[in-house]
Amino acid sequence: LTILNVLKELKEPNATFSSVAKHHHISVTQTQEIFDRFVQISRQPLSKVLCMDEVYTQTSRKNKYSCLILDFLTNRLLDIVYDRKKYSLLNYFERIPKEERNRVEFVIIDMYETYRTVVYRRLPNAKIAVDSFHVIKNFNQAVRNVRIRIMKRFDKKSDEYYLLKKFSWLLEASDVRENRSKFNKRLRRYINYPQILDLILKISPELENAYKLKKKYAHLNRYTRYDEADKKLWTFIDEMKGSPCPEIQKMRKTLIHWFE
């Protein structure tokens, strides 16, 4: 009886695993297990432009992450694979008719190597596009690593350490806009965020180089036309070669590895 009541309540538009579990005095995991056991969602046909993304699924399974298969253009969920291991995804796509798989033209993924392998082996006509969000995320991590390395050179009581620590978010912000100046007791002056960013970049030529390269990539990603993207990206990758930062050289290798 409990199972039937749980399934019935899960049909409600506003129902969540947590709310249903609380109402029936069972755990969220038990509620999810009931759903997984008795509810079978039909797979939707593959679209021409797919997106493979991961989601954390807190179930009793050994696998913490599931793979979502989505129509990239409509954001419609096509299917869920409750495991993102290579053999599971290869087997999943193998069961889909080859004619249907061959119609897929593009697949958008993050920088998870398994997704790339699966696309190459099971979706032979598809081109891979790495989600720009994840590229920017990796660039921000590279800049963050440069900042931390530079910061460790300074005494914790120094102004340089203070700026690099307290205002680190300015280096990762997509846009640092002009704001009203406020008095900063530590710096003993009225100052706004763009001015603080300038002070941070003057601390280290390496940090300034890493930051400017990250901003340049973000600009290329946003404004470059498809027909000129190949040439401009390779020019940018070549420019990265001159960076003195090992963190940027690592990022350069990542871009080359994923270039297609």
Per-range role (PLM):
Residues 1-8:
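Basic, short loop/linker segments at the boundary and entry of helix-turn-helix/winged-helix-like folds
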Residues 10-12:
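Short amphipathic helical patch at the helix-1/turn junction of helix-turn-helix
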Residues 14-15, 102:
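Residue-level signal for the short linker/turn that defines the boundary of a DNA-recognition helix
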Residues 19-24:
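Short alpha-helical "recognition helix" segments of helix-turn-helix
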Residues 26-118, 125:
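RNase H-like nuclease fold core
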Residues 110-113, 119-166:
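Conserved beta-strand -> loop -> alpha-helix junction used to position metal-binding or nucleic-acid-contacting
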Residues 155-227:
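An anionic, glycine-rich sequence signature occurring as long contiguous blocks
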Residues 219-260:
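Amphipathic alpha-helical
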